[in-house]
Amino acid sequence: VVGGDECNINDHRSLVRIF
């Protein structure tokens, strides 16, 4: 996803943050 490193740490949380 857009996060990159952050996505690796929290996939589900990153999605919520992006949207």
Swiss-Prot record:
Thrombin-like snake venom serine protease. Releases only fibrinopeptides A after 2 hours incubation. Clots fibrinogen with different clotting time depending on the species: cat > human > dog > goat >> rabbit. Glycosylated. It comes from the Eukaryota. GO terms for biological process: proteolysis. This is Thrombin-like enzyme purpurase. Keywords: Blood coagulation cascade activating toxin, Disulfide bond, Glycoprotein, Hemostasis impairing toxin, Hydrolase, Protease, Secreted, Serine protease, Toxin. Belongs to the peptidase S1 family. Snake venom subfamily. One of its GO terms (molecular function) is serine-type peptidase activity. Residues 1-19 form the Peptidase S1 domain. It is found in: Secreted. Monomer. Signal peptide: none annotated. One of its GO terms (cellular component) is extracellular region. The keyword Isomerase does not apply. It is an enzyme of class 3 (hydrolase).
